[in-house]
Amino acid sequence: MLEHLPRWIGALMHNVRAGHSKLVIAEPGLDLGQMTLDLSSPAFANGARFPARFTADGEGLSPPLVWGDVPAGADSLALIVEDPDAPALNPMVHALVWGIPPSERALPEGAIRGDGAGSSDGRDVGRNSMLSEGWLPPDPPSGHGPHDYVFQLFALSGAREVGPNPGRLDFVRAISGHIVAAGMLVGTYSRGEPAAASPGQAALRGNAA
């Protein structure tokens, strides 16, 4: 959709960004627990550029994700993917997955897609910023500079119930006070310029250390 936006408009909005401080994982007062989840992807390194097949310039599939051991006491996992560099008031939600069983250690390529009211194992793919279920492929304006796509994975214990197809607000309310551990992975994408770290990436990495 935004690939047709003239490059000069994207360049004009270069400094208009939601901000990394508005990511879910940076929510004021959100207790992230005492442990870290080791989140990674076999398709790209942390902080590296997305292969095009995961974006609006390619097949638009969700990338594969893997993570390490989940702390004892966690009874579910929840994932949200946000773009804090979107030219908007708030980060754009690219994916939301609720109720991942704690025994799982991966989401394969293309796994984040619409699932109606959810799966029989309790997981449910929620709404992205376009109000549709599934993976919203990265589609940054040409000339706007690199965008971070921040994968935030939470191990939860006793999280409250959410309705079918939860959105970001439902997600934040449900995880608050129930996080055992958290992990983060950043992929980048841009149009019309060389791949480079976005303005907020250094600060984001510092907060995750």
Regions found by a protein language model. Name each.
Residues 1-209:
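N-terminus-centered regions that define maturation/targeting leaders and the start
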